[in-house]
Structures are given as C-alpha cells and as structure tokens.
Amino acid sequence: MSNETKCPFNHTAGSGTTNKDWWPNQLNLNVLHRHSALSDPMDPDFDYAEAFKKLDLAAVKQDLHALMTTSQDWWPADFGHYGGLFVRMAWHSAGTYRTADGRGGAGGGQQRFAPLNSWPDNVSLDKARRLLWPIKQKYGRNISWADLLILTGNVALESMGFKTFGYAGGRADTWEPDDVYWGSEKIWLELSGGPNSRYTGKRELESPLAAVQMGLIYVNPEGPDGNPDPVAAAHDIRETFARMAMNDEETVALIAGGHTFGKTHGAGPASNVGPEPEAAGLEEQGLGWKSTFGTGKGKDTITSGLEVTWTSTPTKWSNDFFKHLFSYEWELTKSPAGAHQWVAKDAGEVIPDAYDASKKHRPTMLTTDLSLRFDPAYEKISRRFYENPAEFADAFARAWFKLTHRDMGPRARYLGPEVPAEHLLWQDPIPAVDHPLIDAADVAALKAKVLATGLSVSQLVSTAWASAATFRGSDKRGGANGARIRLAPQKDWEVNQPVALAAVLETLEGVQKAFNDAQTDGKKVSLADLIVLAGAAGVEQAAKNAGISISVPFAPGRMDASQEETDVDAMAVLEPVADGFRNYLKSAYKTPAEALLVDKAQLLTLTAPEMTVLVGGLRVLGANVGDSKHGVFTDRPGTLSNDFFANLLDMGTEWKPVSAANDVFEGRDRATGAVKWTGTRVDLIFGSHSQLRALAEVYGSADAQEKFVRDFVAAWNKVMNLDRFDLA
C-alpha cells in the first residue's frame, strides 16, 4: 500500500476544482458575506470604540518613541532610526484608498493580509509590522492594528521633529482580506499594453483603480512603465493622487514631505530576493522577501531596487528636499540593482550613509521626484514651498492627516485626545444638533401630515432611498444625515430625477416649516430626519395596503448641511453609475448589471438576503428610476407584497431577451403568448442564479408575506441608519 492510499484524506474541504473554475462568469455573492462574526475572534459584546477610550495613548506613544531608535539586529534601522520605514508603512496602509468606490485605505488594517501584505510596493513592511508586535502585544485589544499603523507613522514624524496636525483612533480591525478589485493583470508589475492592461486609449486608467501597475500603491518611481521621463511621470502622479482625493498642492506636499525622511533600498539585483510573505515557507512565519545578497539586511537591503536618500537630514524634518531639487542639475543613472534613478551633477558628497558614518554620497532623486520640478504646475507649488518653509510644513501636516484619515468617514467616528478641533471640508461636516428633538407623538403626527400631502408611496420611498443609499461602507461617506440630496451635486444627479425630486422636497419642506413654526419650545425637525420619516410613512402605508400593520423604527437626530459645508467635486464621486435597487444604469458597461447590483449592496453592507428582500420590495413600491415598469411584477404597485418573487418564479411565464445586449427581457404567458412583464438582468438574476433563487423561493412562498414585510422593514431601517454613527 502506498503512503498516499494510507491517508484517509487525500483532499480537504475547499480544495479541488471550484465552481469558479467551472463557471468563471458566475455571479459572486461571497463579497456580501465578508467580515462576519464567523471570522471575528472578539467576544460578541466587544466594542472597539470603548476599548480604545481606555487606552493610555501617551504611554503607547512613549513606547513608540523608544522603538524608533532601538535598532534590532534582525532588521537594523537606517541611520539608527526607524522613522522613514514607519512613515512608509503608514503611508502604504492609507494609500490604497481610492475615491471611485471608497475602498482601500487604513481602516481594518488590511496591510496584514493578502494581497497587500505581498505587493511588490510593500517589500520590507512585513518587518515594520513585526517590529511593532511587542507594542501591539502589550496593549492588546485596546488598540487595533489599523490604528497602530497610522499612530506609528505619526509618532515617527514627531520623533523626527515634525509637528503633525492630529490623530484620531477608531479603526476597528478586520480579520480576513477584503475582496477588492485591484486590477485584472496576472503578473506583478505588468506593464501597460498587455492583454489585461488597466490602460486604454491615451493612457486612460481604468476606473476605479488608482495605481499604475498591479502591486503598486500609486506610481512607478522609475517613470511610466519604467521610462525615466519626469514630465510623463507627472501625468501618472496627478491621475493617481487625484483618485486618492488629493489636489496638486496636497500631492506636492505629500511627496516632498514623505521624501524628506529615510531612504530607498536597492543594494543588489532583485534576483537575490526570495518569495513574498504569502509564498514563503512556514519557517519564515509570515515574513517574506528573504534576501541572499550579503547579509540581506542593513546596508545590503533590497526593497524597491532604487538606492536613493533625498536629504542630508534623513531623520530630521527640513526643507532639504526642495533645496536639493532646485539647487542641482540631474543626471540619469542606475542603482546597484539596475533601476533608473538620478544623481546630482557636480555636487559634493553631502548625503550621509545609512550605516557608515565615515561615508557620504551625492544627492539622488527618483524620476517621480523630478516631476515636482519639471511639471509646470508642480514646479510653481514646489518653489513656493521652498521659499516658504512654514507654509510647506502646514501643507504637509494637513495632507498627511487627510491621507491617513480619509477613509474614516465623519468626525463622529474620531476617537482620542489628539483629534484636531478644526472641521475640514473633506470630512463632509454636518452641524451639531442644537435644538430639542421630536418625540414619538411628533413622529406619529408628522407621518400623518406627510401622508396627507398626497405624495405617493413611490415618491416617499424613492426620495428616502435616494438620500440614504449614497452611503458607502468602504469610506463611511454619504447617507441621509445632512440632507445633501437637496444640494448640489446630488439634487442634479440623473438617478435622483431632479424635477420630480424638487417637487417632493418642496412639499416636505412645507411640512417641516409648518411643524417648526408651530413649536414654542425650540423643538425642530430637520429635513434630513423628515425625508427618512416620510419614507417610513410610505413603507408603513404600503404594508397596510398589504393587510399588515408594522411600525418602521425611527431615531431623530439628523441635521441639515449647507451648500458651503459640501465639497461639490468630492461629493460627485458618490453618484451611482448603477443602482440595481432602482433598476438604474447610467450607461452601458462591460460589467453586467447584476454584478453592479452586488457591488452596490456590498457598499451598503448588505447581506444576500437583505439585498434580495430590498430589491423585491422596492420593485412593488414603484421605486424604479423614471417610473420604469421593468421588474414591477405586480398589479397592485404601492402595496408591500411578495408579488415580485411569486410572479418571477411562476412557471407559467416564459422569459426571452428583447434587446441586442440581452439586458431587457419579456415574460410571456406560456399558454397565450401575451406579454405579462418586462424585466432587466437585475430582476431575472433572482430566478436564474441558484443561490438567489433559493432566497427568492423563501419570499415567494404562500406563507411568506408577513416575513417578507418584516425582513424588508429591517433591511430598510438598516440602510436608513448606516451613517448614524452617533447612535452607535
């Protein structure tokens, strides 16, 4: 008997040919079930915000300060200070953020997991996190990895003489990788022009991506596809930083400020570097990129393959970056690893060596550094910063704070004693509650007033959904709080049907004014609250029409933001290109509509059952954009019935595509051939996809009406309150 046949288990659960292998285009619902309690080791009642409030932040920072200059033999500190390494670690933790879908960023501590922990741009950051383990171990659950990575970057800056803008905790850890689209390439650092390239046309970067190559945070420091052209590189810099919410001034400040510290590493050829952490052997214990070049560390370190130290004070804040940038002419050269970089012509040796105090080097720069001089717009900003060091320091402090906090959402989530007092426009500020809130009696009276206006169930539900469904669980932006649906740009979005929306808002504002004017104790209802309350009234009326009495939960406390408190450009990225819940597609896309529905559901933090019940309910409530009849599988719209599911699953109906793109379908009576319904891919997927059909069967059963209403109300209430961090 062979050794193989002696083993009772030749294969284990999860191995073998998968459904994805057989049907690569099958709709993937797994993204809706990430980060559940099943992967979370914390106790069910663990509250990270409360745990962080108990943390002695000053003590943690003191330990981090000590760590900065406590060099370890197993991974020595450049210049005797880990500051540069930890700035890079924090930057790369936050720098995956992108505005298009709000994904990436520092929240969750995703740098610990694949693929980020093994990206070529993150070489050696495995060592940075391992250096932090004794401190994380010491403070345990009271500080997450996500918060610690950013705090360490701040302390690194402070330990090198820089005054930061502030720090906020509140990033709870996740315990498994996010399922994020990072690109279609199959090779790390694959150049543009390949079969899976993220570029089309004249270097047009695919949305929602915000990096130029697979495995990079932003740009290739050698230039586009390794071409050492600073002007061409400026195009890539501007594109990628803009997609991370940074303007030109913030971009210059971040590059110059970050490159004031530390160095890059390219002591020898990349062929000496071993596999990344996810591919390394068990004995490496989660570390990767083991190098056989010399000692493999210290002066022999290979990270990016570039060997650049920008300033004469790499462990101290200074204006040296700009001084060197503008004081010298630059000559193209190569690092010991063969990477393109630049050296100052006719310059003296003024740059210290990281490990030999007797050695000095000429100033060096990256291709992307020189972009700050040779791109006209960047050059103008760079010279201003060079001539005004205090302005540069302030710009870097603010840009660094934005970089490291952009994905945290509103200030209500900020924790700790170092939260800056200043409110910033990119935080989507909302005024604090400054009046008594409505009570249960007021809620009941306002619902009656709303229903008496003559606004339909469809109008009430559509408006509330449009207001709340801008929320993104990725970066915690959007939502009903602030009532920004009445402001530019949201009021003008096609999906919100501007003319119809304006009429509904005008009516609700009349109800709001009448109520507020009648109060004698200062009590008020905000329009943000009233929009949600009106939606609740519509849902309750629709349930009543179905013969079921139910109360939709409601918690007052939302406030109305002003146009001045709204960054129109930053808010524009929240405009949905698709909203399957309203059967809306802005344009034709390569991605199927049903996949865009799942993507939207994931951003709304919905599960597959929640997504299913919401689609079925919103269809019969008439929430489709443009009053489209696609998917309205009922003869009693405005009634919260399970008709969508019952009629979709009816075998008396035969479906056929009626559009060339197979995106619109007719359902005909099998016996008579008469058209009964029309639907989109988003509608029919609930009968076609085996998992979604199983869910549809639950809600389409004869005994499901009450459960359907109850589940719809629960999912509806969840969406209405996604941005209510004040209730947590």
From Swiss-Prot:
Cross-link Tryptophyl-tyrosyl-methioninium (Tyr-Met) (with W-91), sequence positions: Y218-M244
GO biological process: cellular response to hydrogen peroxide; hydrogen peroxide catabolic process
Covalent link (Tryptophyl-tyrosyl-methioninium (Trp-Tyr) (with M-244)) residue numbers: W91-Y218
Pfam families per record: peroxidase
The keyword Isomerase is assigned to this record: no
PROSITE patterns to which the protein is assigned, alphabetical: PEROXIDASE_1, PEROXIDASE_2, PEROXIDASE_4
Site (Transition state stabilizer): R88
Summary of subunit composition and partner proteins: Homodimer or homotetramer.
Name the UniProt record assigns to this protein: Catalase-peroxidase 1
Natural source organism: Burkholderia orbicola (strain MC0-3)
Lineage: Bacteria, Pseudomonadati, Pseudomonadota, Betaproteobacteria, Burkholderiales
